[in-house]
Amino acid sequence: AGLEEGSQEAGAYLAEHDNALLWAGRNRLAAAVKLLDYLNVDSQVGLLTDSCHNYVEQTREGWLHRKGSVSAGHQALVIPGSRGTLTYVCVPGRDTHISLDSISHGAGRKWARSICKSRIDRKYDRNSIRSTRYKSQVVCHDTNLLFAEAPEAYKNVEQVMEALQEYGLVDVIATLRPLITFKG
């Protein structure tokens, strides 16, 4: 099944889709400005990059759904790790055409959110779940979310980055170590 291109239903879906993307972008910007204000940093410093990782885009060849990936059309790409791993700042590599000009948004989940707490509940106490191997702090008031977003719930981002570089999809220009993680 699906939507017929040019139909009223497809038009309505795309309008809602575009509104959702606009809302998400503004929400990310508002969260960033709020954090910068909290840290007493000038929030007019400018935006380095902003990208969605779940959207539909019309290309010359047809419709492309990027789910968990971003467009290689950006000058800078941020490929986040978990709160316990590095985040990578990259530029698109020479061979992005082999992946429909799409780049992984991150390592991806290894476990469903619903099973995380039962798998690692005994590993952490009340305080250790709120810090990382980098000694960074996690700010979150929802215990279930703390477990659902634990580093163990994600695939190995270093292996993902090695593969992306091996296939010529990205060139890493910097890595970022988490200092503080906010979970809403």
Please annotate each region the language model reported.
Residues A1-G184:
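Domain-length cofactor-binding catalytic modules of enzymes
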